[in-house]
Structures are given as C-alpha cells and as structure tokens.
Amino acid sequence: MEQWKCNICGYIYNPETGDPEGDIPAGTSFESLPDSWMCPVCGAGKEEFTKI
C-alpha cells in the first residue's frame, strides 16, 4: 500500500497501521479515509497530502 505525506507537517499516513487515534483501522487505504479525516498532527485536510 502507498504511503501519503502531509505537505504541512511531514506526517506520514501508512495504510498498514491506519490512524488508531482517529479510529481508522489498519488496512484502510488513503482513498478510503472519510473526507472529514484530518492529519492527526497538524489538522490539515486530505487535500494537503501527497503520495510518496
């Protein structure tokens, strides 16, 4: 699975681990994240992420 990097703070979203603090289970692809999901570090929206 592809990882995505926040352009604001550098946080890496890894689908293999998900976002436990945001109740996003492991195995959730970036594309499957709800539109309301935000970076857990800086609060940026999905539009601020770039595939790496």
Curated annotation (Swiss-Prot):
InterPro entries: Rubredoxin, Rubredoxin-like_dom, Rubredoxin_dom, Rubredoxin_ET, Rubredoxin_Fe_BS. The keyword Metal-binding applies. Its cofactor is Fe(3+). Fe cation binds at residues 6, 9, 39, 42. It comes from the Bacteria. PROSITE patterns: RUBREDOXIN, RUBREDOXIN_LIKE. GO terms for biological process: alkane catabolic process. Residues 1-52 form the Rubredoxin-like domain. Keywords: Electron transport, Iron, Metal-binding, Transport. It holds the Pfam family Rubredoxin. The keyword Cytoplasm does not apply. Binds 1 Fe(3+) ion per subunit. Transmembrane segments: none annotated. One of its GO terms (molecular function) is electron transfer activity. Belongs to the rubredoxin family. Monomer. Serves as an electron acceptor for pyruvate ferredoxin oxidoreductase (PFOR). This is Rubredoxin-2. It comes from Chlorobaculum tepidum (strain ATCC 49652 / DSM 12025 / NBRC 103806 / TLS).
